[in-house]
Amino acid sequence: MDNHSSVPWASAASVTCLSLDAKCHSSSSSSSSKSAASSISAIPQEETQTMRHIAHTQRCLSRLTSLVALLLIVLPMVFSPAHSCGPGRGLGRHRARNLYPLVLKQTIPNLSEYTNSASGPLEGVIRRDSPKFKDLVPNYNRDILFRDEEGTGADRLMSKRCKEKLNVLAYSVMNEWPGIRLLVTESWDEDYHHGQESLHYEGRAVTIATSDRDQSKYGMLARLAVEAGFDWVSYVSRRHIYCSVKSDSSISSHVHGCFTPESTALLESGVRKPLGELSIGDRVLSMTANGQAVYSEVILFMDRNLEQMQNFVQLHTDGGAVLTVTPAHLVSVWQPESQKLTFVFADRIEEKNQVLVRDVETGELRPQRVVKVGSVRSKGVVAPLTREGTIVVNSVAASCYAVINSQSLAHWGLAPMRLLSTLEAWLPAKEQLHSSPKVVSSAQQQNGIHWYANALYKVKDYVLPQSWRHD
């Protein structure tokens, strides 16, 4: 596991914030002495002191907000990835990779096209008079040839995600074979030339080849399609390659990673509590970097929406534990061969993989084998963040993070929020501020994605290579 304590800016940030706090105390004390010497106030001394503390708190929080914003900008620039952070090339460097062509009849992933771990379920045929027709976008990329046998331009219409992946693939094709372009023989189909269940009818599938029709290239073309980010690729025929993607709606909805509200966490008191009822400040069972069970404080909710419908992956272990989590969420996986603990996206965990599960008798986390991987659609999403960056849900150890395949990078990215939580606990006016009956817990106020988590999600595409992201 990575060592989080060696972050170069962590100690400097702590010293800076402590200096701010000390300066605020000094300023408050000086102001208090001058006020007492110059005049006699009619306000009771206790109430005056409370008002001073509140004013001092607001000044400190204002400066702290500026510091957090600075850290958010500086973090991607100072981070240097560790070797154990998972697959992918380092930032700013190109690493040559050997790409192996697919063989005839091979599909990636080796699952049904309509599973959540592949392109996902069908959502319904889109016709020209359908409300969803406006969601299809034309592709006028000059590096792509469209056969367009119908002469209606239908082959240029596709979902936004399909267009994005197709454009990436077109660039890869030109790099692999100079002078050759990508050929699209079929995209959105309005004439029902395919089977009853086809993603062509939704603009989520394309049939492709190379412009020179050289069938010896098709195996590598399929591999390039996988690398471009298509969610399901099939070398189904010697004459073409078939590719499809997830729906735009499933991608845009809660990609950050969440659990179901009905899933439970174990409190330090020994009581199991549904995640939908957790509050900031609750201490729940978590996991240290070396796989030891520990209780950790909930400091915020990265996402919380009890009404949102969402697709989840379900992991069943041979010990009877069931974890329900979104596909892009990181789950702890034990590697028995190397005796190492890693974190893997939930939709990439396979049967026979081992996850860490709490032992009822000893309270320790022990490996259990995954015997079934399924999917379910459920209502509500909750993503608590603990100080440790991990949480044990339904007895299964999981990360608090998603989308990025490095637990350490994600944990460092949330360091400003942990720092903010720590400083709030040190502020002298905390008790006065929280004693007001009008104050509502953050968990009750929040409905949606936390602003900081959303900011990190938006900048990830600019600072991280694609191989590090769940796509």
Curated annotation (Swiss-Prot):
Induction data: Strongly up-regulated in the anterior midgut and the posterior midgut in response to bacterial uracil.
Major location category of this protein: nucleus
Residues of the site described as Essential for auto-cleavage: H329
Residues involved in Ca(2+) 2 binding: E150, E186, D189, D191
Gene3D superfamilies the UniProt entry points to: 3.30.1380.10, Hedgehog/Intein (Hint) domain (2.170.16.10)
Gene Ontology annotations for the cellular component aspect, listed alphabetically: cytoplasmic vesicle; cytosol; endocytic vesicle; endosome; extracellular region; extracellular space; nucleus; plasma membrane
Keyword DNA-binding part of the UniProt annotation: no
Keywords annotated in UniProt: Autocatalytic cleavage, Calcium, Cell membrane, Cytoplasm, Developmental protein, Hydrolase, Lipoprotein, Membrane, Metal-binding, Morphogen, Nucleus, Palmitate, Protease, Segmentation polarity protein, Signal, Transferase
SMART domains noted in UniProt: HintC, HintN
Residues of the site described as Involved in cholesterol transfer: D303
Subcellular location: Nucleus; Cytoplasm
Expression sites (tissue/organ): In embryos, expression starts at stage 5 as a few stripes at the anterior and posterior ends, this expands to 17 stripes during stages 8-11. Expression is also seen in CNS and some PNS cells until stage 13-14, and in foregut, hindgut and salivary glands. In larvae, expression is seen in the posterior compartment of the wing, leg and antennal imaginal disks. In adults, high level of expression in specific regions of the proventriculus and hindgut, with slightly lower levels of expression in the posterior midgut. Relatively low levels of expression in the anterior midgut region.
Residues with a covalently attached lipid (N-palmitoyl cysteine): C85
Entry annotated with the keyword Membrane: yes
Family: Belongs to the hedgehog family.
Self-association and partners: Interacts with shf. Interacts with ptc and CG5504/l(2)tid.
PANTHER family xrefs: HEDGEHOG (PTHR11889), PROTEIN HEDGEHOG (PTHR11889:SF31)
Designated name of the protein: Protein hedgehog
Lineage start: Eukaryota, Metazoa, Ecdysozoa, Arthropoda, Hexapoda
The encoding gene: hh
